[in-house]
């Protein structure tokens, strides 16, 4: 998003709107983010875009995680991250400064590289890149979030009774393709009696209980490591109201 704002800043500095820079597009272009033509050079240009350096704490975490894993092979990732966070808090300022200085040095290099990168683009290229940048940013953000939650050991969501049934019956279902197998399983599920479905409903309830218990434990760990932003909204509200009552 920061890069997108930088791009838009270039357009503003030129004193022209997106529509003005695309004179001739006519009614096909209704907003700065509505495009009907995306040049092939998008990928190559975006690939050459400088990447922001990681923060001093994240640099420290990436460095320490393999060490902690080797020392504690049976420990969960969330526990390792909690220990690393504690180690960072206890780290003397003189040692933290090493990571902070490295970040500042890389940030300065990044600023120079991004400046040179933007100078190579024409206003029309900037216009065309905006949508691609936005799309890639949103996809990357979602993917990063998913990877982060996996790394932090967030519990898997509970399965429905139908999903439990699919997992059990899919492999043996008739069909030459996954789509055909799934269709068969779906039809078989519809034909089950309520009493036959009850077994899978019970499994789903047990999975719901498992998820609730694991999430409660996981969110307590996230609070310990300073990641309250990952709590469910209902939990955040409960903690907020609880604090107000105190």
Swiss-Prot record:
What happens to this protein after translation, modification-wise? Phosphorylation by PKA within the HMG box 1 impairs DNA binding and promotes degradation by the AAA+ Lon protease.
- Keywords per UniProt: Activator, Disease variant, DNA-binding, Mitochondrion, Mitochondrion nucleoid, Phosphoprotein, Primary mitochondrial disease, Repeat, Transcription, Transcription regulation, Transit peptide
SUPFAM superfamilies linked: HMG-box (SSF47095)
Locations listed in the record = Mitochondrion; Mitochondrion matrix, Mitochondrion nucleoid
The record, for InterPro entries, names: HMG_box_dom, HMG_box_dom_sf, HMGB
Q: Which residues carry this modification: Phosphothreonine?
A: 122
UniProt site positions, description: Intercalates between bases and promotes DNA bending:
58, 182
* DNA-binding region location: 50-118, 155-219
Q: Which GO biological-process labels does this protein carry?
A: mitochondrial respiratory chain complex assembly; mitochondrial transcription; positive regulation of DNA-templated transcription; regulation of transcription by RNA polymerase II; response to hypoxia; response to nutrient; transcription initiation at mitochondrial promoter
Transit peptide feature, positions: 1-42
Tell me what effect the entry lists for residue 162 to A: Moderate reduction in DNA bending
Function statement: Binds to the mitochondrial light strand promoter and functions in mitochondrial transcription regulation. Component of the mitochondrial transcription initiation complex, composed at least of TFB2M, TFAM and POLRMT that is required for basal transcription of mitochondrial DNA. In this complex, TFAM recruits POLRMT to a specific promoter whereas TFB2M induces structural changes in POLRMT to enable promoter opening and trapping of the DNA non-template strand. Required for accurate and efficient promoter recognition by the mitochondrial RNA polymerase.
Disease involvement = Mitochondrial DNA depletion syndrome 15, hepatocerebral type: An autosomal recessive mitochondrial disorder characterized by severe intrauterine growth restriction, neonatal-onset hypoglycemia and liver dysfunction, mitochondrial DNA depletion in liver and skeletal muscle, and abnormal mitochondrial morphology observed in skeletal muscle. Hepatic pathology includes cirrhosis, steatosis and cholestasis. Progression to liver failure and death is rapid with no evidence of neurological impairment or other organ involvement.
Q: How does it assemble?
A: Monomer; binds DNA as a monomer. Homodimer. Component of the mitochondrial transcription initiation complex, composed at least of TFB2M, TFAM and POLRMT. In this complex TFAM recruits POLRMT to the promoter whereas TFB2M induces structural changes in POLRMT to enable promoter opening and trapping of the DNA non-template strand. Upon metabolic stress, forms a complex composed of FOXO3, SIRT3, TFAM and POLRMT. Interacts with TFB1M and TFB2M. Interacts with CLPX; this enhances DNA-binding.
Q: What is this protein called?
A: Transcription factor A, mitochondrial
Task: Give the species this sequence originates from.
Answer: Homo sapiens (Human)
């Amino acid at each position: 998003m920061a890069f997108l704002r930088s791009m838009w800043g270039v357009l503003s500095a030129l004193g022209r709107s997106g529509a003005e820079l695309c004179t001739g597009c006519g009614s096909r272009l209704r907003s700065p983010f509505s495009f009907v033509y995306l040049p092939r050079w998008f990928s190559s240009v975006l690939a050459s875009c400088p990447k922001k350096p990681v923060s001093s704490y994240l640099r420290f975490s990436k460095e320490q995680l393999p060490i902690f894993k080797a020392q504690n092979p049976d420990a969960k990732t969330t526990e390792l991250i909690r220990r690393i966070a504690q180690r960072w808090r206890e780290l003397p300022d003189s040692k933290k400064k090493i990571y902070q200085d490295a970040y500042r040095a890389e940030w300065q290099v990044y600023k120079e590289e991004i400046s040179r990168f933007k100078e190579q683009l024409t206003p029309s290229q900037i216009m065309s890149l905006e949508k691609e940048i936005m799309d890639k940013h949103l996809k990357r953000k979602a993917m990063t979030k998913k990877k982060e939650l996996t790394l932090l050991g967030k519990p898997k969501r509970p399965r429905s009774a139908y999903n439990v049934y699919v997992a059990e019956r899919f492999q043996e279902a008739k069909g030459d393709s996954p789509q055909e197998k799934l269709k068969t399983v779906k039809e078989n599920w519809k034909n089950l009696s309520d009493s036959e479905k009850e077994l899978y409903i019970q499994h789903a309830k047990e999975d719901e209980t498992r998820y609730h218990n694991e999430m409660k434990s996981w969110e307590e760990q996230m609070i310990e490591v300073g990641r309250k932003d990952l709590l469910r909204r209902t939990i955040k509200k409960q903690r907020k109201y609880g604090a107000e009552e105190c």
